């Protein structure tokens, strides 16, 4: 065999080895993030927001008619050592359905994982807590919501807390277009208290589109957008600040839950608690949801 052929084979072997090593590294990273979330589940009531519902309780009130829980993790592109993975564990529950509306609670824990000090370094922890009451008008639902967000640094000095509370009006609706399900959640609120942020008001919308291909497989696309008004006295910013996320993928149905595999893009305002600058990432990950 010629030296050129041997060199070519050696180069191919190195390339294949590097690709396999990179894949193993990403897989190990995803498993570590899941483990971090599983261990963190006792630290707080970690739950995502409420979703529109089609089935309502009978004329009499019903206690705990429904609940929803999720575990999710996704990679963050860009190579910034502060932002490598993003992961969530949480759920929501309707404590009481009184037929013409419901009382609900929500809690969510998010871990932002970087690689500054070690391969998997939890840099930020974010808690969301909500309480809401709603009323139904036909197929529409309107809710009053108290929404709390608290952001923390992990293993890092931060003398001042970062938190805000929003009193919000929210609209929820399910739509059906020839078998394609569309869930719409939109809200507008006033930031009633805040610490170390300049937010004054909030607008948000969440649109989730799903289409079932077979009993076991479906497709989905989801878009979320959020805007905050700001107080120029605090940080000198005058224009509203924006966040957004779009993801799409497949939904694999099992007897006890649903696995979503997705890819997309996210633009997050004030991603770093020191710099308060927006960051845009490509994302790829999974989500487990109970039925």
Predicted regions and their residues:
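Cleavable N-terminal export/targeting peptides
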Residues: 1-50, 291
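Transmembrane beta-barrel domains of bacterial outer-membrane proteins
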Residues: 46-291
């Amino acid at each position: 065999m010629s030296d050129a052929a041997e060199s070519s084979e050696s180069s191919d072997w190195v390339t294949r080895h590097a690709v396999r090593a990179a894949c193993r590294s990403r897989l190990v990273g995803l498993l570590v993030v899941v483990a971090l979330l599983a261990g963190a589940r006792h630290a707080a009531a970690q739950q995502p927001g409420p979703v529109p519902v089609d089935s309502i309780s009978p004329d009499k009130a019903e206690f705990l008619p429904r609940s929803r829980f999720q575990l999710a993790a996704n990679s963050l592109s860009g190579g910034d050592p502060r932002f490598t993975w993003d992961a969530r564990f949480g759920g929501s529950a309707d404590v009481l359905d009184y037929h013409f509306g419901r009382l609900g609670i929500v809690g969510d824990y998010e871990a932002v994982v970087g690689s500054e000090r070690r391969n998997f370094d939890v840099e930020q922890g974010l808690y969301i807590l909500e309480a809401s009451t709603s009323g139904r008008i036909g197929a529409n639902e309107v809710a009053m919501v108290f929404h709390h967000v608290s952001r923390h640094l992990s293993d890092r000095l931060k003398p001042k807390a970062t938190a805000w509370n929003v009193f919000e009006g929210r609209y929820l609706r399910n739509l059906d277009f020839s078998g394609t399900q569309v869930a719409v959640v939109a809200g507008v609120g006033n930031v009633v208290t805040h610490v170390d942020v300049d937010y004054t008001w909030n607008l948000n919308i969440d649109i989730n589109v799903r289409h079932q291909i077979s009993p076991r497989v479906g497709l989905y696309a989801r878009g979320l957008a959020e805007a905050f008004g700001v107080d120029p006295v605090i940080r000198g910013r005058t224009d509203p600040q924006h966040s957004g996320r779009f993801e799409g993928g497949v939904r694999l149905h099992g007897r006890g839950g649903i696995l979503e595999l997705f890819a997309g893009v996210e633009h997050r305002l004030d991603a770093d608690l020191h710099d308060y600058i927006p960051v845009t990432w490509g994302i790829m990950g999974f989500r487990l949801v109970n039925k």
